[in-house]
Amino acid sequence: MLLNPRIKTNIDAINLRSFIVNLTDKKIFISAAGAGMGYSVAKMALDAGAEVYATDLKLEGLEELKSLGAKTETLDITNENLIQDYFSKSPNFNGIVNMAGWVHHGSILDVNKNDWRNSFLINLDSMFFVIKAAIPGLKKNGGGSIVNMASLASSVKGFPFRAAYSASKAAVIGLTKSVAVDFMSDGIRCNAICPGTIETPSLHERMDVMAKKLGSKKAAEEWFVSRQPMGRLGQPNEIASLITYLLSDAGSYATGQPFIVDGGTIA
């Protein structure tokens, strides 16, 4: 983990010994669960007693979750017909976690039509498809919790070379608030997570690109860490713990909020 050795941290202790929530008897759907933050959410939800339905575009990563007790299936969340079919055959869920995302690097001058459309298809449309398919089941269950992955790079803060990504993630926050207001009387809560820089496979892919410019992977890692006020990158479990809380009854008074978890970036 890319941490600052001078700063004491207890990240490894983020498990049920230090963060106790109860998801027993709750059925939780999670997209992009095969790696990174999605995997951490699935693992933590399983540890909290949930019945986890983990999906991803690829089988890789899902196999370990299956061995831990999750019900797994490959699913293209950009295909509305496949989403409708999946939810028509699934039980009524208590929680929905939309984790899928794609980062385009570039200013608006670097964004072509396909980049723009793909950014919105993966980052926003997929959530629209999933939420629309899931709400009837949530209503039948008397309510539930939806958590959408947004980003600090959104309406929260501007970042260089994130034009398409930031626009799509700002729209996620808007969708989240609309769903929260429209279905509050049905007992459905909807929140968004706006992480800062989290150490995931996706981030390491971006580090590899940066390494070509800076000369080495180590230099790229140091560059990413140097931008963090806490002197380290965030870890997937630090996001998963908040999402697990929001899925649980402990988070029952929270809705319509973009939760910022950024290591002090905009403090």
Task: Annotate each PLM feature.
Residues 34-36:
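Conserved glycine-rich cofactor-binding loop
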Residues 100-104:
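Conserved NAD(P)H cofactor-binding loop of Rossmann-fold oxidoreductase domains
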Residues 107-108, 115-120, 224:
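Substrate-binding pocket helix/loop in short-chain dehydrogenase/reductase
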Residues 131, 168, 176:
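Active-site helix of classical SDR
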Residues 151:
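Residue(s) in the substrate-gating loop at a strand-loop-helix junction
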Residues 184, 189, 254-256:
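Short, small/polar-rich loop/turn modules that mediate ligand/substrate recognition or access, typified
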Residues 232-261, 266:
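C-terminal substrate-recognition "lid" of short-chain dehydrogenase/reductases
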